[in-house]
């Protein structure tokens, strides 16, 4: 009414138009004027409609990429937090194991201090006595695999 052209309503595109525009966008996010004219004629749309569709599609892509980036950042932060918690748990477990080892060592030291010193058992036999015992039993000349029961039977009781 006041000399300004009336704004058109929202343009709805057919499935075919949308598919063709998406295919073109897949290869080129920006169009030359010549290509815009070709697409407009092929799809029975105006150059302005093609230009606006591509602007909107670039904004949609930008928004999607921002959302993906945010999801990845959130996943990275969660992963870092999980790693940090895992390291804390491992450190705590390691400290507990060290404390247990120290306690065991202290207990062993206390037990050793409280227990009377043990002397190793004394051996009264000498090699010559051992050889004498073998001679007495007749073992020194026994062929390999000889019946040991015979030798045991000769042991004085």
Swiss-Prot record:
Residues 73-94, 130-139 have a biased composition (Basic and acidic residues). It is found in: Nucleus. The keyword DNA-binding applies. Residues 73-157 are annotated as: Disordered. One of its GO terms (biological process) is negative regulation of transcription by RNA polymerase II. SUPFAM superfamilies: Homeodomain-like. Residues 6-65 bind DNA. GO terms for cellular component: nucleus. GO terms for molecular function: DNA-binding transcription factor activity, RNA polymerase II-specific; RNA polymerase II cis-regulatory region sequence-specific DNA binding. Keywords: Developmental protein, DNA-binding, Homeobox, Nucleus. It comes from the Eukaryota. Residues 95-116 have a biased composition (Low complexity). The keyword Nucleus applies. Pfam families: Abdominal-A, Homeodomain. Sequence-specific transcription factor which is part of a developmental regulatory system that provides cells with specific positional identities on the anterior-posterior axis. Belongs to the Antp homeobox family. This is Homeobox protein abdominal-A homolog. It comes from Schistocerca gregaria. The gene is ABD-A.
